[in-house]
Amino acid sequence: MSKPHLLIVEARFYDDMADALLEGAKFALEEAGATYDVITVPGALEIPAAIAMALDGADNDGTEYDGFVALGMVIRGETYHFDIVSNESSRALMDLAVSESLPIGNGILTVENDEQAWARVRRSDKDKGGFAARAALTMIELKKKLGG
């Protein structure tokens, strides 16, 4: 059986936090023996579009991925923008997962402040990057088990 090959799509709006999320995801995938590619997008709203582009590329003889890991950070500010980015990025990932039967680990974090963010991105703490990667691996296995 071949190793799963995943695409990590990371939003780099908060570089230091993105580094920590990516570190956790890479560690989890390497520990599981999976292979991966990493692409970067400007923010969380662009992550679902990048996954859709990867699907289109696979349809045109590009790289085919067994699953996807979405990594990003949305920190509440003073405007309604937080709600839009949080809700729409999650909705778009769910739409892709359901309509395309895609294994996606959602590591787009929505937090109130930097303290909450750091507690979630560090591998030594909540390791949400690793959690998202392991979720994607679990969904890949479920898809195989169900005949997908």
From Swiss-Prot:
<dbReference type="GO" id="GO:0005829">
    <property type="term" value="C:cytosol"/>
</dbReference>
<dbReference type="InterPro" id="IPR036467">
    <property type="entry name" value="LS/RS_sf"/>
</dbReference>
<comment type="function">
    <text>Catalyzes the formation of 6,7-dimethyl-8-ribityllumazine by condensation of 5-amino-6-(D-ribitylamino)uracil with 3,4-dihydroxy-2-butanone 4-phosphate. This is the penultimate step in the biosynthesis of riboflavin.</text>
</comment>
<dbReference type="GO" id="GO:0009231">
    <property type="term" value="P:riboflavin biosynthetic process"/>
</dbReference>
<feature type="binding site">
    <location>
        <begin position="78"/>
        <end position="79"/>
    </location>
    <ligand>
        <name>(2S)-2-hydroxy-3-oxobutyl phosphate</name>
    </ligand>
</feature>
<comment type="pathway">
    <text>Cofactor biosynthesis; riboflavin biosynthesis; riboflavin from 2-hydroxy-3-oxobutyl phosphate and 5-amino-6-(D-ribitylamino)uracil: step 1/2.</text>
</comment>
<dbReference type="InterPro" id="IPR034964">
    <property type="entry name" value="LS"/>
</dbReference>
<protein>
    <recommendedName>
        <fullName>6,7-dimethyl-8-ribityllumazine synthase</fullName>
        <ecNumber>2.5.1.78</ecNumber>
    </recommendedName>
</protein>
<feature type="binding site">
    <location>
        <position position="120"/>
    </location>
    <ligand>
        <name>(2S)-2-hydroxy-3-oxobutyl phosphate</name>
    </ligand>
</feature>
<dbReference type="Pfam" id="PF00885">
    <property type="entry name" value="DMRL_synthase"/>
</dbReference>
<dbReference type="InterPro" id="IPR002180">
    <property type="entry name" value="LS/RS"/>
</dbReference>
<feature type="binding site">
    <location>
        <position position="106"/>
    </location>
    <ligand>
        <name>5-amino-6-(D-ribitylamino)uracil</name>
    </ligand>
</feature>
<feature type="binding site">
    <location>
        <begin position="44"/>
        <end position="46"/>
    </location>
    <ligand>
        <name>5-amino-6-(D-ribitylamino)uracil</name>
    </ligand>
</feature>
<feature type="active site" description="Proton donor">
    <location>
        <position position="81"/>
    </location>
</feature>
<dbReference type="GO" id="GO:0000906">
    <property type="term" value="F:6,7-dimethyl-8-ribityllumazine synthase activity"/>
</dbReference>
<keyword id="KW-0686">Riboflavin biosynthesis</keyword>
<feature type="binding site">
    <location>
        <position position="13"/>
    </location>
    <ligand>
        <name>5-amino-6-(D-ribitylamino)uracil</name>
    </ligand>
</feature>
<keyword id="KW-0808">Transferase</keyword>
<dbReference type="GO" id="GO:0009349">
    <property type="term" value="C:riboflavin synthase complex"/>
</dbReference>
<feature type="binding site">
    <location>
        <begin position="73"/>
        <end position="75"/>
    </location>
    <ligand>
        <name>5-amino-6-(D-ribitylamino)uracil</name>
    </ligand>
</feature>
<comment type="similarity">
    <text>Belongs to the DMRL synthase family.</text>
</comment>
